[in-house]
C-alpha cells in the first residue's frame, strides 16, 4: 500500500468534528488549510454538516463513534484522522475497502492510561477500598495487602499502551508478561517485559498472573474474547483491569466470577454500554472500581492530539507517509 498522498494543488479543506481551541485552527490556517469546525457533542445525535463538503480533503473526528456516513456529503476525502485510538465505528465494509487513509491518536494516551493502570494495581495491592469502606464505621483492623515485587502482571494487548504499563510495573519490581498477536514483531518494548508471548499462550499466562490488564482494541477477534471460560483460567484471587474496550469482556460472566470470588476484584474503565446505566450492578459491587472511560484523560490531552495532527498535516503537504496509519482490515 502506498501511504503518501498526492500533493495538494488547492487549499486543503479540513473539516473538524470536535471543539478545538482556536490556536490550533490558526496553526492549521497558517499552514495553508481551509478549516471548518462543527462540533459534535458526545451526548448529541450526529449533526448534519452545515457547510458544503464536496471539496473536503481531510476529516478530523472520533473513530470510536463516527461511522463516516458523512462521506456521502464528502466524496473526495483522502484522509480521516481519529481523535480516539479506537476506530471501531468506522469499520464498515464499504469504507474498509476504500482508498481513504485513516490515522489515529495512538501514543497520545499511553502515559495517562498507564498511570491510571498502576494506580488501580496499587489500589488493590494496598487494600485502599477497604480503608475507604472502613472509615465511616471507624473500623480499625489489619487490612490484607500484596507485595508487588513478588507479583506477576499479565498485559494482554502489548502495544504502545501495554508497553507503557509494563515499563511502570517493572519499576515497581513486578514480573511482567506481555501477550500480543505477533510476539516476534519488534516494537521497542521488549526490555519492559520479562517475557512476551503470543495469544495462543494466554491461558497459561492468566493462570500465573496476580493482576491481568486488558489493553485490547475492539475488533472482530477481540469481541467477547474474555468470557467465563477464559476468566476461570485466571489465577484464583487475582485482579482484572480493563483499559482497552468494553466489548472485549462478557460482563455477565465477569459478574459471576466476581460474586463467586474466583476473582478478588476488577477495575473497569470501559464498558459495553457507555455511560454505564445507573441500574447496572457494577455500581453496587464492593470489589469493582468503576471509572467513566477516563483513563486516557490528562490536562495535556488536547495538546498531544492536536500536535500529532498538525505534524501529520505537514507530512501530508509534503507528500510524505503519515504517522499512525491504521490497517482498516485489522482495525488498529
Predicted segment positions?
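An N-terminal-biased, well-structured beta-alpha scaffold segment characteristic
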Residues: 1-101, 227-229
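C-terminal helix-to-coil terminal segments
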Residues: 2, 24, 103-116, 130, ...
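Residues at the starts of beta-strands that form the adenosine-phosphate
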Residues: 11, 34, 152, 174-175
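Short beta->alpha connector loops at strand-helix junctions that form conserved
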Residues: 39, 83, 101-108, 200, ...
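Short, Asp-centered acidic motifs that coordinate Mg2+ and/or phosphate
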Residues: 57-58, 79, 211, 239, ...
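Phosphate-binding beta-alpha-beta segment of Rossmann-like dinucleotide-binding domains, i.e.
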Residues: 97-152, 164, 171, 186
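Glycine-rich Rossmann-fold phosphate-binding loop(s) that bind the pyrophosphate
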Residues: 158-159
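Rossmann-like adenosine-cofactor binding region
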Residues: 183-281, 297
Amino acid at each position: 500500500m502506498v501511504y503518501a498522498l498526492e500533493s495538494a494543488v488547492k487549499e486543503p479543506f479540513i473539516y473538524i468534528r470536535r471543539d478545538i481551541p482556536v490556536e490550533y485552527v490558526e496553526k492549521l490556517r497558517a499552514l495553508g488549510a481551509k478549516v471548518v469546525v462543527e462540533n459534535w457533542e458526545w451526548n448529541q445525535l450526529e449533526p448534519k454538516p452545515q457547510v458544503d463538503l464536496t471539496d473536503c480533503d481531510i476529516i478530523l473526528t472520533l473513530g470510536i463513534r463516527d461511522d463516516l456516513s458523512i462521506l456521502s456529503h464528502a466524496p473526495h476525502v483522502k484522509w480521516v484522522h481519529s481523535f480516539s485510538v479506537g476506530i471501531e465505528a468506522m469499520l464498515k465494509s464499504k469504507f474498509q475497502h476504500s482508498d481513504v487513509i485513516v490515522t489515529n491518536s495512538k501514543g497520545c494516551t499511553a502515559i495517562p492510561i498507564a498511570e491510571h493502570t498502576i494506580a488501580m494495581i496499587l489500589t488493590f495491592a494496598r487494600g485502599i477500598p477497604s480503608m475507604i469502606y472502613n472509615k465511616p464505621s471507624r473500623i480499625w483492623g489489619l487490612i490484607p495487602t500484596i507485595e508487588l515485587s513478588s507479583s506477576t502482571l499479565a498485559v494482554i494487548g502489548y502495544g504502545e499502551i501495554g508497553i507503557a504499563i509494563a515499563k511502570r510495573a517493572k519499576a515497581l519490581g513486578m514480573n511482567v508478561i506481555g501477550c500480543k498477536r505477533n510476539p516476534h514483531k519488534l516494537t521497542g518494548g521488549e526490555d519492559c517485559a520479562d517475557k512476551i508471548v503470543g495469544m495462543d499462550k494466554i491461558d497459561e499466562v492468566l493462570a500465573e498472573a496476580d493482576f491481568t490488564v486488558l489493553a485490547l482494541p475492539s475488533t472482530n477477534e477481540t469481541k467477547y474474547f474474555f468470557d467465563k471460560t477464559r476468566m476461570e483460567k485466571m489465577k484464583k484471587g487475582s485482579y482484572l483491569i480493563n483499559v482497552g474496550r468494553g466489548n472485549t469482556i462478557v460482563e455477565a460472566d465477569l459478574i459471576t466470577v466476581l460474586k463467586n470470588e474466583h476473582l478478588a476484584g476488577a477495575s473497569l474503565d470501559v464498558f459495553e454500554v457507555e455511560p454505564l446505566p445507573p441500574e447496572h450492578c457494577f455500581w453496587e459491587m464492593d470489589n469493582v472500581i468503576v471509572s467513566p472511560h477516563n483513563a486516557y484523560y490528562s490536562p495535556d490531552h488536547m495538546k498531544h492530539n492536536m500536535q500529532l495532527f498538525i505534524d501529520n498535516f505537514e507530512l501530508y503537504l509534503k507528500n510524505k507517509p503519515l504517522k499512525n496509519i491504521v490497517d482498516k482490515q485489522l482495525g488498529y
